[in-house]
Amino acid sequence: MFVDQVQVEVQAGKGGDGMVAFRREKFVPFGGPAGGDGGHGGSIILYVDEGLRTLMDFRYQRHFKASAGGNGQGKQMYGRAAEDRRIAVPAGTTVTDADTGEVLGDLTEPGQTLVVAKGGRGGRGNMHFVSPKNTAPEISENGEPGEHRFIKLELKVLADVGLVGFPSVGKSTLLSVVTQAKPKIAAYQFTTLVPNLGMVQLDDGTDFVMADLPGLIEGASQGVGLGIQFLRHVERTRVLLHLVEMDPDNGREPLDDYDQIRKELGAYDDNILKRPELVVATKMDLPGAAERFADFKAALLARGVAADHIFEISSLTHRGVTPLMHKTAEVLKTAPHFEPEQAAVKTADYKYQPEPALKVTRDSDGTFVLTGDKIERAFKMANLDHEDGAMRFARQLRSMGVDDALRDAGAESGDLVAIDDFTFEFVE
């Protein structure tokens, strides 16, 4: 099964907790703090695997979690850093944040990697909190939570040449003639339901990748038929071979077919119409096809289409196929490469930016609830198992303006205050 679009959940690993420990050694009566730091949590990393062609592997597994870092130990020993979770994707995969729509990256080159969820840093051990006032601190940090997000993976087939046209105009047949690909071929519409790729190898040593794309019909750019589901694959092709059948009995006019496909491509993305295009008249072995082709070619020439960009072929007899492939290779030499989708560029900005506002709300039972990224992160990294750690967290809250915010919200001494799942009493 061909899968080209999927949403997955990624959870990076939490950093390891820092350690509260002291040096205990013979003849060293005041060894001091010796708690080590926690190890970094594992990140979620996507990488391009040349052997993959679809996102099929994500059909049955859509949740990925990296390991947490190891906790710090005594004797200033650091916790072990967790291994990153590496996930293979095919070349041509665009990664976006499912919630914001931000493009995180466009994976097009073999071996290319992208970090989609960063592991949390390890918490610091008590050896970092020594001060002149507290030479034996019982303070440490818990590991930082790893990033969590939902991402959307969208595969756009990477091919040099794309075959476009109405259903059953001979795209799959042409691909099977010029490559070793074995697409499904039958005399009914929408035989091709997935893109098929093949390598064209010419006698002069030139080669290129050709993609047989599912047939388009009127309204495809609005989702009719296979619609946008496969129009996206045209975006990554450098040259288009536009196939138009000359069958006198199909009930359609070749020029109308040509115009309709061009209209749908332009409605989806007008940049596609700027790509080099060769017009290919197919099924020229049928009776009456030559007359239809003569009228069709005359109409194209009148519109300014170059004569050397119009071909007539029969995939059944292989007539005209070799000249078409050589011309395609010639056009490819000067055809521009597609521009990868630009990921949001993350640059360091050292200008002052205020922290997101601390929010104080009140539950129906009278408990004041504190929310905000900074305060929630500080809480998750606070080790409240020791009095020193609890006092440090209280000082952090005060420095963030929590006391003033609670008073402004009407809190009085003795009222309950909640952060996440932790509840404490407000004391003036």
UniProtKB/Swiss-Prot annotation:
Binding-site residues for GTP, renumbered to this chain: 165-172, 190-194, 212-215, 282-285, 314-316
Location, primary (coarse class): cytoplasm
Domain OBG-type G per the UniProt entry, residue ranges: 159-333
InterPro entries: G_OBG, GTP-bd, GTP-bd_Obg/CgtA, GTP-bd_prot_GTP1/OBG_C_sf, GTP1-OBG_CS, GTP1_OBG_dom, GTP1_OBG_dom_sf, OBG_GTPase
A GO MF label: GTPase activity
Subcellular location per the Swiss-Prot or TrEMBL entry: Cytoplasm
Biological process per Gene Ontology, one example term: ribosome biogenesis
Reported cofactor(s): Mg(2+)
Highest taxon in the source lineage: Bacteria
Keywords: Cytoplasm, GTP-binding, Hydrolase, Magnesium, Metal-binding, Nucleotide-binding
Entry EC number(s): 3.6.5.-
Homology family: Belongs to the TRAFAC class OBG-HflX-like GTPase superfamily. OBG GTPase family.
Protein name: GTPase Obg
Organism: Lacticaseibacillus casei (strain BL23)
